[in-house]
């Protein structure tokens, strides 16, 4: 008797895990055809709205963004040219502060007096009068 009870227990546990809980339920939902039609109309309306919206933003990008980008670039170039013209007339005055270019040990590259990211157009090498 106990062996039979164990087999029935094993069988019931196996069936519980292998058979889905809702196996006997209907595989479709019963709803009205009118609700389905309304839902399809809403989906189509959303698709149409998305299409019109994307076309609108494409037009904004091409007809407003493009010319704005061209005008902004032309303005930036004009300002750059004015700045370059002004920069030609400015004298290069280097006050020569005492704390600039202090070297206690030579760098292991070049002549040893210039840093790794040295730029001759911007940086000025102070000559010692010793």
Curated annotation (Swiss-Prot):
Mitochondrial intermembrane domain ranges by topology: 81-130
Which GO terms of the molecular function aspect are on file? enzyme regulator activity; oxidoreductase activity
Key word Lipid metabolism present in the record?
no
One family from Pfam that matches here is COX6A
According to its record, how does it sit in the membrane?
Single-pass membrane protein
Q: In which pathway does it act?
A: Energy metabolism; oxidative phosphorylation
Q: Could you tell me the keywords of this UniProt record?
A: Membrane, Mitochondrion, Mitochondrion inner membrane, Oxidoreductase, Transit peptide, Transmembrane, Transmembrane helix
Q: Which residue intervals are topologically Mitochondrial matrix? A: 32-61
Q: Which SUPFAM superfamilies match?
A: Mitochondrial cytochrome c oxidase subunit VIa (SSF81411)
Main location group: mitochondrion
Q: Name one GO biological process term.
A: mitochondrial electron transport, cytochrome c to oxygen
InterPro entries in UniProt: Cyt_c_oxidase_su6a, Cyt_c_oxidase_su6a_CS, Cyt_c_oxidase_su6a_sf
Concerning PROSITE patterns, the annotation shows: COX6A
Transit peptide residue numbers: 1-31
Q: Where in the cell is it found?
A: Mitochondrion inner membrane
Q: Which domain of life is it from?
A: Eukaryota
Q: Does the keyword Mitochondrion apply?
A: yes
**Cellular-component GO terms for this entry:** mitochondrial inner membrane; mitochondrion; respiratory chain complex IV
Please give the start and end residues of each transmembrane region: 62-80
Question: Its function?
Answer: Component of the cytochrome c oxidase, the last enzyme in the mitochondrial electron transport chain which drives oxidative phosphorylation. The respiratory chain contains 3 multisubunit complexes succinate dehydrogenase (complex II, CII), ubiquinol-cytochrome c oxidoreductase (cytochrome b-c1 complex, complex III, CIII) and cytochrome c oxidase (complex IV, CIV), that cooperate to transfer electrons derived from NADH and succinate to molecular oxygen, creating an electrochemical gradient over the inner membrane that drives transmembrane transport and the ATP synthase.
Q: How does it assemble?
A: Component of the cytochrome c oxidase (complex IV, CIV), a multisubunit enzyme composed of a catalytic core of 3 subunits and several supernumerary subunits. The complex exists as a monomer or a dimer and forms supercomplexes (SCs) in the inner mitochondrial membrane with ubiquinol-cytochrome c oxidoreductase (cytochrome b-c1 complex, complex III, CIII).
Report the sequence similarity comment from the record: Belongs to the cytochrome c oxidase subunit 6A family.
What protein name is recorded for this chain? Answer: Cytochrome c oxidase subunit 13, mitochondrial
User: What is the native source organism of this protein?
Assistant: Schizosaccharomyces pombe (strain 972 / ATCC 24843) (Fission yeast)
Supply the gene name. Answer: cox13
């Amino acid at each position: 008797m106990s062996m039979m009870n164990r087999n029935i227990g094993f069988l019931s546990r196996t069936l519980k895990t292998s058979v889905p809980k809702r196996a006997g339920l209907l595989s479709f939902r019963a709803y009205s055809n009118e609700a389905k039609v309304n839902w399809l109309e809403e989906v189509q309306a959303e698709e149409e709205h998305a299409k019109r919206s994307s076309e609108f933003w494409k037009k904004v990008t091409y007809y407003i963004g493009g010319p704005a980008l061209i005008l902004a670039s032309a303005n930036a170039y004009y300002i750059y040219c004015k700045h370059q013209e002004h920069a030609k007339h400015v004298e290069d005055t280097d006050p020569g502060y005492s704390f600039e270019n202090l070297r206690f040990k030579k760098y292991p590259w070049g002549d040893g007096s210039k840093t790794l990211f040295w730029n001759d157009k911007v940086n000025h090498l102070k000559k010692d009068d010793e």
